[in-house]
Amino acid sequence: MAVIYYDKDCDLSLIEKKLIGIVGYGAQGHAHAQNLRDSGLKVIVACVEGGRGWKKATADGFEVMCVAEMAKKADIIMMLAPDTSQAKIYKDSIEQGLKPGKMLMFAHGFNIHYGQIVPPSFVDVTMIAPKCPGYMLRQVFTEGAGAPSLIAVEQDASGKAKELALAYAKGIGSNRAGILETTFAEETETDLFGEQAVLCGGTTSLVKAGFETLVEAGYQPEVAYFECLHELKLIVDLMYQGGIAYMRDSISDTAKYGDFTRGPRVINEDTYETMGEILGEIQDGSFAKEWILENQAGRPVYNSLRRMESEHLIEEVGAELRSMMSWLKKKR
């Protein structure tokens, strides 16, 4: 079972005199910076000068500067820029500012695990990865609670890397919920697999397959949309709240029997085999290589697929039906 750390394991005083630099002020960056500041820690923010993040961080009362200047000043540097831009940011603006005693932190392990960023041996390299969106990390903190995080240590030059990372986790409030120990490899590989096989790739493909099956059988696209996409939220919310068993206890016996007997015919042995292949491509680095080369080439495949998917009938039907739902209009 996983090792989980709580408040008793976290000593905020270890970083009270250190200057923390946050790279990026987007979804996660703003939450980290504000939670750390509210915990009494010294925080500076690095963004693209004049950009939206720069303006927002300035408006929120932070000292904002370019990444290179921040890298020279900060004792702890947390990389919260998009994964695809981190390697260039590191090479151009951070690497030269690193000195013994500093710690480089990440919220996702991709660039370290796949060698896109190779820090010098004299710095600590750690990860604190909150398991929630940035807005939720901030919200629960202000309510006096916290969000769970993952912690990993890739490099322990100081001999105190884990303790310092735990202190950082306390600064963003994760000590109030729990900090689960992992590795850069495990976090990266499971995160990518979850995205590709279940949360994004698996779910969207399943939804579209169900929608297309009904439409091709002569059912109205609008009804197919409701049954295969719209109602998905009802089921996911139940699983999110209490797990699979809780969801099953909340649906009809007819739905439950169909779940037990037909579900395994949809997700069958062939699916398991394909999932294993997808995991293998993540583990051996071939997916990472493919994605890195795709970015270097200007994303031709990505852009083509994105355009093609946006033209799927389910998007047209969904837009029409969502326009009928006043509660969705209010959220936009």
Swiss-Prot record:
Keywords: Amino-acid biosynthesis, Branched-chain amino acid biosynthesis, Magnesium, Metal-binding, NADP, Oxidoreductase. Signal peptide: none annotated. Mg(2+) 2 binds at residues 191, 227, 231. Binds 2 magnesium ions per subunit. SUPFAM superfamilies: 6-phosphogluconate dehydrogenase C-terminal domain-like, NAD(P)-binding Rossmann-fold domains. Its EC number is 1.1.1.86. Pathway: Amino-acid biosynthesis; L-isoleucine biosynthesis; L-isoleucine from 2-oxobutanoate: step 2/4; Amino-acid biosynthesis; L-valine biosynthesis; L-valine from pyruvate: step 2/4. It comes from the Bacteria. One of its GO terms (cellular component) is cytosol. This is Ketol-acid reductoisomerase (NADP(+)). It comes from Dehalococcoides mccartyi (strain CBDB1).
